Amino acid sequence: MKYLGLALISAVFLIGACQAETPSQKCEEKYKGNTDKISCLHHCKYQYYGFIDVNYNIAQSEIRKFSNVLMDYGVVDKSKKRELKKVMHECAKQVKKEARKDSHWLNCRTSINYYRCVLTSKLIGPQRFDKAIQDYDKTISV
């Protein structure tokens, strides 16, 4: 009888943990079958990761979070932190400028363009980048 409460609480947490999804799973489920919005898949995941905000903005806090993940997962050496943040700031400015030029404001395409810009930097290797994002994705429950 003493352990009944503990067993029930443990069961509730176990059930909750089993039902938890990663951002990738959640976003893929959200956009499954919706070909018009499939371009928003990256934005959905990056929003859960904290790399881009709900309104497609890429501010200092989002850049800090993204750069920390890339350094923590070994994509970029920590000694190149300043260079990485500079690249990310430049990419953020570039995608905002492109959005204004194309007579649309920030949208899902902005997220994809930002991702591409950061990924094509000489500091980042695509294979390490993808693995780091996949590994980071597994650490988040939605």
Curated annotation (Swiss-Prot):
PROSITE patterns in the record: PROKAR_LIPOPROTEIN (PS51257)
Keywords recorded for this protein, A-Z: Blood coagulation cascade inhibiting toxin, Disulfide bond, Hemostasis impairing toxin, Secreted, Signal, Toxin
Signal peptide coordinates: 1-20
Disulfide bonds: 27-44, 40-108, 91-117
Keyword field contains Metal-binding: no
Tissue: Female salivary gland (at protein level).
Compartments where found: Secreted
GO CC field: extracellular region
Gene Ontology molecular-function annotations: molecular sequestering activity; odorant binding; toxin activity
One Pfam family in the UniProt entry: PBP_GOBP
Major localisation: secreted
Keyword Secreted included in the entry's annotation: yes
Entries under InterPro entries matching the protein: PBP/GOBP, PBP_GOBP_sf
Domain of life: Eukaryota
One example of a Gene Ontology biological process annotation: suppression of blood coagulation in another organism
Described purpose of this protein according to its UniProt entry: Inhibits contact coagulation pathway activation in the host by sequestering anionic polymers, such as polyphosphate and dextran sulfate, and thus blocking interaction of protein components of the pathway with negatively charged surfaces. Inhibits dextran sulfate-mediated autoactivation of host coagulation factor XII (F12). Inhibits dextran sulfate-mediated autoactivation of host factor XI (F11). Inhibits polyphosphate-mediated activation of host F11 by thrombin (F2). May inhibit dextran sulfate-mediated bradykinin generation in host plasma.
Similarity annotation: Belongs to the PBP/GOBP family.
Name of the protein: Salivary protein 15a
Gene source species: Phlebotomus duboscqi (Sandfly)
Name of the gene: M02
